[in-house]
Amino acid sequence: MAATARHYDTILSPVITEKATLLSEQNKVVFRVSADASKDEIAAAVEELFKVKVTKVNTLVTKGKTKRFRGIIGRRSDVKKAIVTLAEGQSIDITTGL
């Protein structure tokens, strides 16, 4: 199956934080994903784009913070993240582009 535009729209960007780096030692990779993406869609997109085998996908939604700038109250957008567990022996180098 070839990568489609939906696969590229599903995976927005890798999350590069201290916690995500620690998870990479457990064969897990963290991505920002589209808010309407399901776990099955995320797994299919990662498998197709990176040519790896996905064993599990966990998702979470981080609620946007309320911020104030010069007395005007605004709100940051909610962000959906996916923690993707790869099969044993598989890895993704997230420093290379898609």
UniProtKB/Swiss-Prot annotation:
InterPro entries: Nucleotide-bd_a/b_plait_sf (IPR012677), Ribosomal_uL23-like (IPR013025), Ribosomal_uL23/eL15/eS24_sf (IPR012678), Ribosomal_uL23_CS (IPR001014). Keywords: Ribonucleoprotein, Ribosomal protein, RNA-binding, rRNA-binding. The keyword Nucleotide-binding does not apply. One of its GO terms (biological process) is translation. One of its GO terms (cellular component) is ribonucleoprotein complex. Pfam families: Ribosomal_L23. GO terms for molecular function: rRNA binding; structural constituent of ribosome. Disulfide bonds: none annotated. One of the early assembly proteins it binds 23S rRNA. One of the proteins that surrounds the polypeptide exit tunnel on the outside of the ribosome. Forms the main docking site for trigger factor binding to the ribosome. Part of the 50S ribosomal subunit. Contacts protein L29, and trigger factor when it is bound to the ribosome. Belongs to the universal ribosomal protein uL23 family. This is Large ribosomal subunit protein uL23. The gene is rplW.
